[in-house]
């Protein structure tokens, strides 16, 4: 069985993060960050993030 790829979703709006997960479905494992600082921390703690989707206009 293949390992699910890991996607980090970075957006300050929870609604947007939820919509992305709904669109992409159960094919992937998800990590979520609500700002850039949290995303940087998560990248350091989680080896093997395959893709990062991020909002380019966030307060932090």
Model-identified regions with their sequence ranges:
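Two-component/phosphorelay signaling modules centered on CheY-like receiver
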Residues: 14-31
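A short coil/beta-turn micro-motif at the C-terminal edge
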Residues: 13-14, 37
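Short acidic/histidine-rich motifs immediately flanking catalytic phosphotransfer sites
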Residues: 46-51
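Conserved sequence signature across two-component system core domains
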Residues: 10-11, 33, 52
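Non-catalytic signal-transmission and effector/linker regions of two-component phosphorelay proteins
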Residues: 1-8, 13
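Receiver (REC) domain active-site loop signature in two-component systems and cognate sites
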Residues: 58
């Amino acid at each position: 069985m293949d390992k699910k790829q890991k996607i980090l979703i970075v957006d300050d709006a929870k609604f947007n993060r939820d919509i992305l997960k709904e669109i992409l479905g159960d094919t992937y494992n998800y990590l979520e960050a609500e700002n850039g600082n949290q995303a940087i921390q998560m990248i350091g703690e989680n080896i093997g993030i395959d893709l990062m989707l991020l909002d380019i206009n966030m307060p932090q």
